[in-house]
């Protein structure tokens, strides 16, 4: 395994700047960089260590010799305070992601959940900056979602940020057999407030989601969607449709001998086996 060094910097415009942590392997193999984008309510720390102090994906990738970047999305964690967090849109995050890729060069984007849309839109508008996309239970493009009505219980008021409840966390995030349940409190206190507008855009409330319209723009970009069998909001059919829409590959973890995974694959027991899975897939596509 390689050693690595860590450096930090920011990209983007105030107040929507984005914190970036760079893991540079030694020796640096000059590999295609891998950018890890976290999901809603999280920060980049979810890729550093697990709640029970096991090695996270960012450190593992760097030790294998891959240049790895993790971020705190604008308005999250070390990126700093955003006065209108409740009203912050997906486009702010996409802009910051593009700014990062313009600085470091074309990269693999690994997305999780909410940031799935960021990956699709970044590839749509700047396809030459995206070498491949690995979507971990990614949010689908709005093209695959019905327009939610304003009166739905899934619509969130945009006069305040969203706070993830303990009940919903246990129901949707940490329910799996492979999550380290004895360390739930360590995980729960790491969660942060989230933009209500982004949550509504994700659900395509009143047709406000972000559409691709021409998925063929992404056909030349290798895409892989990876989903576990214990993820309540990402059943097989939903994530398989996302992969098919982009003519990508779909990995259902039980089918490759990895059952019992939920929404937080990077934190669950067996997380490094999943990392090996997408690393091997990237190799098979000639990306890294």
Predicted segments, located by residue:
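N-terminal cap/lid segment of alpha/beta-hydrolase-fold proteins
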Residues: 1-27
């Amino acid at each position: 395994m390689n050693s690595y060094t860590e450096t930090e910097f920011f990209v983007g415009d105030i107040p929507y700047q984005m914190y970036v942590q760079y893991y540079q392997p030694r020796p640096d193999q000059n590999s295609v960089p891998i950018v890890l984008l976290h999901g809603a309510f999280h920060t980049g720390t979810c890729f550093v260590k697990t709640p029970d102090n096991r090695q996270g994906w960012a450190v593992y990738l760097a030790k294998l010799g891959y240049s790895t970047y993790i971020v705190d999305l604008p308005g999250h964690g070390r990126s700093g305070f955003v006065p209108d967090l409740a009203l912050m849109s997906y486009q702010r995050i996409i802009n910051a992601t593009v700014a990062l890729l313009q600085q470091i060069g074309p990269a693999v984007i690994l997305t999780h959940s909410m940031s799935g849309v960021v990956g699709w839109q970044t590839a749509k508008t700047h396809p030459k900056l995206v070498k491949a996309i690995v979507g971990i239970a990614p949010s689908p493009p709005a093209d695959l979602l019905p327009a939610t009505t304003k009166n739905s219980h899934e619509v969130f008021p945009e006069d305040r940020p969203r706070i993830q409840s303990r009940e919903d966390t246990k129901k949707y995030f940490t329910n799996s057999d492979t999550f380290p349940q004895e360390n739930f409190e360590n995980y729960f206190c790491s969660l942060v407030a989230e933009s209500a507008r982004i949550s509504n855009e994700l659900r395509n409330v009143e047709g406000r989601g972000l559409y691709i319209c021409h998925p063929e723009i992404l056909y030349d970009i290798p895409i892989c969607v990876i989903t576990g069998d214990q993820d309540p909001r990402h059943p097989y059919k939903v994530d398989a449709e996302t992969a098919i829409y982009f003519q990508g590959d779909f990995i259902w973890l039980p089918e490759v001998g990895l059952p019992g995974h939920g929404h937080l694959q990077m934190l669950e027991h067996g997380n490094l086996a999943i990392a090996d899975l997408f690393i091997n897939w990237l190799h098979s596509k000639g990306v890294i």
